[in-house]
């Protein structure tokens, strides 16, 4: 895949340019991510803060995750699309929630690990050969 790539929220008010492939991509099955995504998991692409540039104003909220980590969430104030999360203890890592859409990037955003599988719905089957963690 050729970088940089761009993506935008549903209304287009918030966008980003990603200059490098994600460090890693995971699928999180925790209950919070199931609520966020309205599906059995949400995808998180971990990227270096220096490799991504955001445009547009975002709102934020914070909570303590089940892991005990602080989770600061950024989202579009107009359409509500979640853009990214950041843990203040790891400020150089962006946990990107909004992935670029397009066939050419699919492989770069395929999850290599599924986390919080202890909370996944019983009917969802993780593909054979993918690493799993019951928690994080």
PLM region descriptions:
Residues 1-8, 13-136:
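A short Gly-Trp-Pro
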């Amino acid at each position: 895949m050729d970088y940089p790539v761009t993506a935008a929220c549903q209304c287009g008010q918030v966008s980003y340019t990603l200059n490098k492939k994600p460090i890693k991509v995971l699928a999180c099955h925790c209950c919070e991510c199931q609520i966020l995504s309205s599906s059995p998991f949400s995808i998180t692409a971990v990227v270096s803060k220096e490799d991504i540039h955001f445009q547009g104003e975002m709102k934020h909220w914070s909570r303590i995750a089940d892991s005990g980590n602080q989770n600061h969430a950024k989202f579009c104030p107009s359409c509500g699309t979640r853009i990214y999360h950041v843990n203040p203890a790891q400020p150089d890592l962006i946990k990107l929630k909004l992935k670029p859409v397009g066939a050419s990037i699919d492989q770069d955003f395929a999850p290599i690990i599924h986390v919080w599988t202890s909370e996944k719905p019983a009917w969802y089957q993780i593909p054979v050969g993918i690493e799993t963690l019951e928690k994080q």
